[in-house]
């Protein structure tokens, strides 16, 4: 737990350590559901990149000339154990991974709005395989903690991080619900693709606020619906075929949530409609994707008949 030393004195280190130990006992069980991801991680962790590139759209770890053709085939097979790849792109020892999401486009939209990350302590909530953490690492933060409850994403990130040789990134099997343990610990929190999965979004935002240091920054990205009025869609069972979706806000509704949670300087700096060019089926994600979630006769509606999603980007501050 490299990240403990970076937390504030107000953080509940004892409870965090106990929770970490409990989750490690759980994830290290000798069961198929864990071994299917642990075994390729151990296989991949043997390879150490002699170079990395985190500044370009493709997170590049190692290069093909560093290894044999047989080793590259082994790496490719192990990486495919983590399908479907949702975030990317990556290039790992010459193996190109074209993920479902064109995550570099999201990064391009938000990068110029970021605070200075150099020397900062950062949390990426729901970090998935860590694509954005690697992009953050290019700016030399003191530390980035990825909070991610999925075993698949946990081991995928650990494999990539081990191969990269980076020492200022770490992932833990936690969820956004554990943020109250991290009082005033982070300079910057990224909360992307999370808030619409929370049944009490304002409570979640308040937990994020409490986890930030005074003057800290929240970068929030979410799906939402078009419209000028401050309302949120509350879908019946699914929204764009995604279960576990609670409130899907309009832009003004989201801004109101942020203010009611206690944030200041709330800036919605990007609002764009979703596109099947940005979320699509690939060799590394072979299941249904965005175009399959829309009404085939009217792409401005989801299959359920709801307004098709926009994506909103918001930057906000915790007062000093």
Curated annotation (Swiss-Prot):
Keyword Nucleotide-binding: no
Keyword terms, alphabetized: Transferase, tRNA processing
SUPFAM superfamilies tied to this protein: S-adenosyl-L-methionine-dependent methyltransferases
UniProt GO BP: tRNA wobble uridine modification
A molecular function GO annotation: transferase activity, transferring alkyl or aryl (other than methyl) groups
Binding site for carboxy-S-adenosyl-L-methionine: 87, 101, 106, 126, 148-150, 176-177, 192, 196, 311
Keyword Plastid recorded: no
Record's catalysed reaction(s): carboxy-S-adenosyl-L-methionine + 5-hydroxyuridine(34) in tRNA = 5-carboxymethoxyuridine(34) in tRNA + S-adenosyl-L-homocysteine + H(+)
A family per Pfam: Methyltransf_9
Enzymatic class: transferase
Enzyme Commission number(s) from the entry: 2.5.1.-
Subunit structure: Homotetramer.
Function: Catalyzes carboxymethyl transfer from carboxy-S-adenosyl-L-methionine (Cx-SAM) to 5-hydroxyuridine (ho5U) to form 5-carboxymethoxyuridine (cmo5U) at position 34 in tRNAs.
Descriptive protein name: tRNA U34 carboxymethyltransferase
Gene name of this polypeptide: cmoB
């Amino acid at each position: 737990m490299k990240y403990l030393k970076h937390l504030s004195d107000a953080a509940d280190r004892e409870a965090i350590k106990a929770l970490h130990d409990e989750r490690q006992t759980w994830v290290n069980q000798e069961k198929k559901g864990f071994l299917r991801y642990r075994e390729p991680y151990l296989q991949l962790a043997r390879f150490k990149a002699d170079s990395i590139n985190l500044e370009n759209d493709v997170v590049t770890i190692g290069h093909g000339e560093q290894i044999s053709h047989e080793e590259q085939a082994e790496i490719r097979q192990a990486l495919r154990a983590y399908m479907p790849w949702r975030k990317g792109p990556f290039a790992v020892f010459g193996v190109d991974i074209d993920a479902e999401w064109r995550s570099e486009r999201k990064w391009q939209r938000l990068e110029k709005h970021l605070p200075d990350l150099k020397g900062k302590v950062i949390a990426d909530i729901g970090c998935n395989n860590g694509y954005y953490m690697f992009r953050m690492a290019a700016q030399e933060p003191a530390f980035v903690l990825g909070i991610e409850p999925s075993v698949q994403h946990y081991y995928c990130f650990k494999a990539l991080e081990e191969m990269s040789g980076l020492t200022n990134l770490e992932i833990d099997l936690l969820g956004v619900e554990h943020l109250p343990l991290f009082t005033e610990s982070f300079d910057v929190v990224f909360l992307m693709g999370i808030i619409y999965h929370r049944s009490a979004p304002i409570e979640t935002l308040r937990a994020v606020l409490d986890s930030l240091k005074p003057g800290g920054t929240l970068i929030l990205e979410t799906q939402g619906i078009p419209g000028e009025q401050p309302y949120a869609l509350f879908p019946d069972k699914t929204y764009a075929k995604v279960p576990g979706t609670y409130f899907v806000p309009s832009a003004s509704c989201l801004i109101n949530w942020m203010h009611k949670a206690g944030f200041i300087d709330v800036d919605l700096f990007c609002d764009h409609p979703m596109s099947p060019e940005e979320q699509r089926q690939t060799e590394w994600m072979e299941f249904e994707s965005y175009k399959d979630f829309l009404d085939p006769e009217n792409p401005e509606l989801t299959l359920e008949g709801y307004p098709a999603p926009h994506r909103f980007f918001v930057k906000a501050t915790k007062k000093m």
